[in-house]
C-alpha cells in the first residue's frame, strides 16, 4: 500500500488563539515510485491565493486530517486478485416516466447522448429529475465517433468519422424543446477532421434551441478546438449560459490520460478565452476525474491554476474504467476526501463545486444549483437595471 500522507504547510491564524500557527494536514499522497516535482515556481497570482487561503480561511483548520491511508482511498486490487468496488460506488438502475420518454425520443430521432455512450452511472437520476425535479440530459452532437483516443473514454474513435448531419442542429433543438427539460448540456466528440473543428455546427445548435426555448438554460461542454480562438469565440457568443471544457485530470497526468493533441495549458487557455468572449454573466466550468494516479498535492495545485484562470464552477468525480481496454483505476477515493476537496474549492473562491464519487461533469444535482445561481444573478441584474421609483410628492 502506498504511503498516503505528508504535510502541506498551510499557515492559518485561528480567531481564538493569539499569534498561534496551525499546520494543516493535506491530502498529499506521495507514492514510493514518484520523483520530486520539478514544476516551476507558480505565478504571483497563485502565491497570493495560497497566502490568502492560509491566513483568511477559518474552514481550512479542519481540512483533511486523515490519519490512515484508508481514510483517503481504497485499493482496487490486482489482475489476479481484484477487489470489489466500495459500497459508495454501487450504481442505481435507471427508470421513471421521464427517463422512458427521453430514451424513446432519442431512438426515434437517431440522436446520441454522452450519458449512454460513456455509460454514466447517473443517467436514470438525471433523466428522471431525481430529488430536485430538474430533469437534465447531455446530448452529443457532431456524430458518435471521435477523432481522438483518450485513455479513459468509451466513445468510439476514427481518423475519418462520417460527416456531420447538416440537419442535426434543427433536429436536436426540436427534440430538446419537446422534452420539458429545465437545463440541457450539449456536448460533442472532437472533430479535428473539420476546418472549424465543428464549432459552427455547435453554435448553430445552441442558437436554434434558444429560439425555440429562450428560457431554457444551455450548457455547452466543448472540446478544445485545438486552442483556436476563433472557434472558442464562435461558441462563446452563441447564446449559451454555461461554457464548459474539461481539463480531465491534474496537470502532471495529462499525457497519460488524454490524447496527445490535448494538454493542460491549451485547455486552460480555452477557458480563459471563453470568459473574455462570452456575454457578461456567462459561467465557465471544468471537471477532473480522481483515481487516475494523481496525488492530493497535484489536485490542489491544479485547482489553484483553474481558479486563477477565472473558472466559476469545478466538479470532481471518481474515474471508472469503461472496459479492460481502457486505463485502469488507480484507487477509489473516499466520499470524505471528495468532501474535503469541495470545501477547499469553495474557500478558493469557486462559485460552486460538485465533488463526490458518482459526480460527473454533467450532473443533475450540480445543474440544479447552477440553474438557481444563474436565476439569482439575472434577478439581481434586472433589479439593479430597473429605474428607481420616483419619490412621492
UniProtKB/Swiss-Prot annotation:
Domain Radical SAM core: 131-351
Cofactor note: Binds 2 [4Fe-4S] clusters per subunit. One cluster is coordinated with 3 cysteines and an exchangeable S-adenosyl-L-methionine.
Enzyme class (EC, first level): transferase
InterPro entries, alphabetized: Aldolase_TIM (IPR013785), Elp3/MiaA/NifB-like_rSAM (IPR006638), LIAS_N (IPR031691), Lipoyl_synth (IPR003698), Lipoyl_synth_mt (IPR027527), rSAM (IPR007197)
Keyword Cytoplasm set for record: no
Main subcellular location: mitochondrion
MF terms in GO: 4 iron, 4 sulfur cluster binding; lipoate synthase activity; metal ion binding
Cofactor list: [4Fe-4S] cluster
Pfam family, one: LIAS_N
PANTHER family with a match to the protein in the record: LIPOYL SYNTHASE, LIPOYL SYNTHASE, MITOCHONDRIAL
HAMAP family reported for this sequence: Lipoyl_synth (MF_00206), Lipoyl_synth_plantM (MF_03128)
Additional observations: This protein may be expected to contain an N-terminal transit peptide but none has been predicted.
Record's protein name: Lipoyl synthase, mitochondrial
Protein species of origin: Vitis vinifera
Lineage of producing organism: Eukaryota, Viridiplantae, Streptophyta, Embryophyta, Tracheophyta
Amino acid at each position: 500500500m502506498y504511503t498516503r500522507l505528508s504535510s502541506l504547510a498551510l499557515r492559518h491564524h485561528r480567531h481564538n488563539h493569539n499569534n498561534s500557527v496551525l499546520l494543516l494536514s493535506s491530502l498529499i499522497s506521495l507514492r514510493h515510485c514518484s520523483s520530486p516535482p520539478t514544476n516551476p515556481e507558480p505565478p504571483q497570482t497563485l502565491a497570493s491565493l495560497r497566502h490568502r487561503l492560509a491566513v483568511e480561511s477559518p474552514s481550512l483548520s479542519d481540512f483533511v486530517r486523515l490519519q490512515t491511508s484508508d481514510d483517503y482511498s481504497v485499493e482496487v486490487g490486482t489482475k489476479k486478485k481484484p477487489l470489489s468496488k466500495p459500497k459508495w460506488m454501487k450504481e442505481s438502475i435507471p427508470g421513471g416516466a421521464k427517463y422512458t420518454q427521453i430514451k424513446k425520443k432519442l431512438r426515434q430521432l437517431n440522436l446520441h447522448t454522452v450519458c449512454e455512450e460513456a455509460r454514466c452511472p447517473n443517467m436514470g437520476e438525471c433523466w428522471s429529475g431525481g430529488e430536485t425535479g430538474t430533469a437534465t440530459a447531455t446530448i452529443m452532437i457532431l456524430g458518435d465517433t471521435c477523432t481522438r483516443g483518450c485513455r479513459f473514454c468509451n466513445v468510439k474513435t476514427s481518423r475519418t468519422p462520417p460527416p456531420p448531419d447538416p440537419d442535426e442542429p434543427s433536429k436536436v433543438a426540436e427534440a430538446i424543446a419537446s422534452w420539458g427539460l429545465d437545463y440541457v448540456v450539449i456536448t460533442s466528440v472532437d472533430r479535428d477532421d473539420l476546418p472549424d473543428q465543428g464549432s459552427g455546427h455547435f453554435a448553430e445548435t445552441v442558437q436554434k434551441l434558444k429560439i425555440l426555448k429562450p428560457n431554457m438554460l444551455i450548457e455547452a461542454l466543448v472540446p478544445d478546438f485545438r486552442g483556436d480562438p476563433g472557434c472558442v469565440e464562435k461558441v462563446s457568443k452563441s447564446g449559451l449560459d454555461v461554457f464548459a471544457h474539461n481539463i480531465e485530470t491534474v496537470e502532471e497526468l495529462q499525457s497519460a490520460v488524454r490524447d496527445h493533441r490535448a494538454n493542460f495549458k491549451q485547455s486552460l487557455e480555452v477557458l480563459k478565452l471563453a470568459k473574455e468572449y462570452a456575454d457578461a454573466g456567462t459561467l465557465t466550468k471544468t471537471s477532473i476525474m480522481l483515481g487516475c494516479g494523481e496525488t492530493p498535492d497535484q489536485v490542489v495545485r491544479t485547482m489553484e491554476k483553474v481558479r486563477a484562470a477565472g473558472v466559476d464552477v469545478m466538479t470532481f468525480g471518481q474515474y471508472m474504467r469503461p472496459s479492460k481496454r481502457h486505463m485502469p483505476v488507480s484507487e477509489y477515493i473516499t466520499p470524505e476526501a471528495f468532501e474535503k476537496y469541495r470545501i477547499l474549492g469553495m474557500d478558493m473562491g469557486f462559485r460552486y463545486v460538485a465533488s463526490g464519487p458518482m459526480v460527473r461533469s454533467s450532473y443533475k444535482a450540480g445543474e440544479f444549483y447552477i440553474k438557481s445561481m444563474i436565476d439569482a444573478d439575472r434577478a439581481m441584474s434586472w433589479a439593479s437595471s430597473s429605474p428607481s421609483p420616483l419619490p412621492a410628492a
